[in-house]
Amino acid sequence: MNNKVLQTLEYDKIKLQLNDFLSTPTGLQEANELQPVSDVDLINHWLAETADAVLIDRLKGGIPLSKLSDITPHLKRLNIEASLSATELSEMSLVLRNTSTIASFFEQMQDEAIGESLRVLPEQAKNLVTLPDITRQIQIAIDSSGRLNDEASYELKHVRDRINGTEQAVKNQMQAYTRGKTAQYLSDPIVTIRSDRYVLPVKAEYRSQFGGVVHDQSQTGQTLYVEPQAVVTLNNKLSELRVQEQAEEQRVLQELSATLAPHTEEIANNVTILGHFDFVNAKARLAARLDAMQPMVNTENKVDLQQAWHPLLDKDLAVANDIALGDGYKAIIITGPNTGGKTITIKTLGILQLMAQSGLFITTKRPSTVGVFHEIFADIGDEQSIEQSLSTFSSHMANIVSMIDRIDDKTLVIFDELGAGTDPAEGAALAIAILDKVASLGAFVIATTHYPELKLYGYNRPETLNASMVFDVSTLKPTYQFLMGVPGQSNALAIAKRLGFGDDVIGAATALTSDADQDLNQMIADLVAQRDAVKQHDVALSEQLKATEKQSEALSEQQRQLEKERAKIVLDAKNEANHIVAATKKQAEQMISEIRKARLNAGQSAGELSEQDLQAKKRQLDGLRQNSSLEKNKILQKAKRAKQLAAGDEITVQSYGQQGTLIKQHSNGQWEVEMGILKMLVDEDDIVKTEATAKAQQSKAKQKQQKIVKTKTASGSARATAKSRLDLRGVRYEAALAELDRYLDTAVLANLGTVEIIHGKGTGALRQGVTEFLRSDRRVKAYHFANANAGGDGATIAELS
């Protein structure tokens, strides 16, 4: 992309706003080097990065990066085996800690809902190389201010402890001078430092009272800074300890530097990745500041900007417009008077196209589409004074000439006031010739002009559309609204009349205007009036649609509340029934136990008992039980509904009260429903089968149930003799658990100590259900899978109480 268009369209002003959000030198460098590109894949990749960062910024407050220093010089010094200072190591430590933080941040998001929505950045984060041991070692040794901690080494802590003790001894000795009888010999009763040694400010005439060493004197010579003889030895010891401290500090710094040296390449790569994350963070926060959104990219250069405004204008003050180019026409000619907003409109198209091709979000209120232009040219500049008009015209023409040789069918050309600055007749003719030349090269064009001759250009040229800016004659002010398909209307006479010119002047001016011009202006006025009428009708329809949608939502909410209340009533009734059945079942079990004892006392063996007779009533009671836990199971409910509904079913859509036919099921829990001539997607919860469909399915289910009953009757007769094995293979989950419940009753009454339940392996769902059932059943003392040679985990052995 040529640099001139970036300057003309003020691209750098957009880039400079990124700097407000950057915190790393690498991120700042990447922002400074940002340029629009024409590689579609790269543009989409950049936009995907920005989209990820926008989502993270909205849900997580952004990627948690600290303000980092430039550690490139430090890495170079490490590569030549130099030792870093404590401050430099502190800056390295901050980079290492940020690396660990960012890597952990993205790992945690992968386990959250946001992780499924991120497309690009998590993969980049996987390239970060964390050095946890080294990071921890440096963090322990050096604090955030760049000072070596006492914990950096045992020897350093030992030396510093001795320094602290010696300093305290010196201070105690010196305080004896400042508080005792000798205080009268001091200029001030304080202890100060000269040449790294503790001294007293002694009056010159009392020098002999202290002995020791004079290290300095005041400017007047009346005060001498004396190190008393009594503390000379302590100060000497203190100096020696400080030398030891410096030596140990240097040793620690060399050791830490040597630890980092083998990892300079990984750290440099981390710096690049962190800087890039800083850059995409800035793009996301710029999008938030501008209230911008992600554009779609069209490789055929069909541009469709919906409610777009210039990003350098205040959104609350700017007028948003729809701007479309490339779909049916490749040129837009905006005609009309100056100060109506023509220039800002074409600049908006240009700057948003540059932003999108740089991976930045664009300032539109609705989803919009941009093209991918290999080159964008712009000739924009206000008309100058009469004295400068020749030079202005010449510079514009020179600029256009330089474009012509580089224009092709992948180029967007922007002209502002084409042909201005010279004789109007020649300027209009030249403008038409230039537009024809650019069109012959296949370029996409948007141009502004106030020449009336170009109003007919859009009607006489293929793939060309007229446009204008709306002017409110009643207020004599431009509205800055962009109107496509209608050329600019001349409002000079209307404005003159409103400003007070008499009918004689207006009439004379009208008479001097050609009939063609009057007809054209009248045609434009009629088109504008029709557009306004259609727009008002559209607004009315939109308001009516919103009211209808609001009413529909209210009815849907009312329906949901009714369904919730109905479900609660049914559930309460079922729970009450369960309590009654449980009490009755307990009585029945007690009666069965008493009958069994009576028969045993009468001399009958357990094997002679008619278990079918004893269990008949109990099974009837079991059948009455309403399994509230299964009713509450949303997964089972969804599975049941999915099995109950099928394509071709006649159904009723509850929210509309309309009958229809199911066409096909979609993966998002919705069905495609045909209602008369309409086809629409409806939530599965909103669908109820019609009575005819339900009866047909009940008939099929009844026939199937009769087959199952016959099978179970034969199986039940076999189990009546209380066999020690129950085979549940091929039985549906719920039916299998009910059958297991009945079998355990039979086995307990038959005094069976151990039973075998065969459930097979399959998906493991039935095996897990049997295991859960046995775990919570009081009749089961213990259970385990069968031996490997006896079925393994395809069968469970249960020991009964």
From Swiss-Prot:
Residue ranges occupied by any Smr domain in the UniProt entry: 726-801
Region (Disordered): 696-721
Binding-site residues, ATP: 336-343
Keyword set includes RNA-binding: yes
SUPFAM superfamilies, sorted: DNA repair protein MutS, domain III, P-loop containing nucleoside triphosphate hydrolases, SMR domain-like
Domain of life of the native organism: Bacteria
GO terms assigned for molecular function: ATP binding; ATP hydrolysis activity; ATP-dependent DNA damage sensor activity; endonuclease activity; mismatched DNA binding; ribosomal large subunit binding; rRNA binding
Enzyme Commission code: 3.1.-.-, 3.6.4.-
GO biological process: mismatch repair; negative regulation of DNA recombination; rescue of stalled ribosome
Amino acid composition bias (Basic residues), ranges on this chain: 701-710
Keywords: ATP-binding, DNA-binding, Endonuclease, Hydrolase, Nuclease, Nucleotide-binding, RNA-binding, rRNA-binding
SS bonds (residue pairs): none
Function comment: Endonuclease that is involved in the suppression of homologous recombination and thus may have a key role in the control of bacterial genetic diversity. Acts as a ribosome collision sensor, splitting the ribosome into its 2 subunits. Detects stalled/collided 70S ribosomes which it binds and splits by an ATP-hydrolysis driven conformational change. Acts upstream of the ribosome quality control system (RQC), a ribosome-associated complex that mediates the extraction of incompletely synthesized nascent chains from stalled ribosomes and their subsequent degradation. Probably generates substrates for RQC.
Subunit-level organization: Homodimer. Binds to stalled ribosomes, contacting rRNA.
NCBIfam families in alphabetical order: mutS2
Family to which the UniProt record says this protein belongs: Belongs to the DNA mismatch repair MutS family. MutS2 subfamily.
Protein's recorded name: Endonuclease MutS2
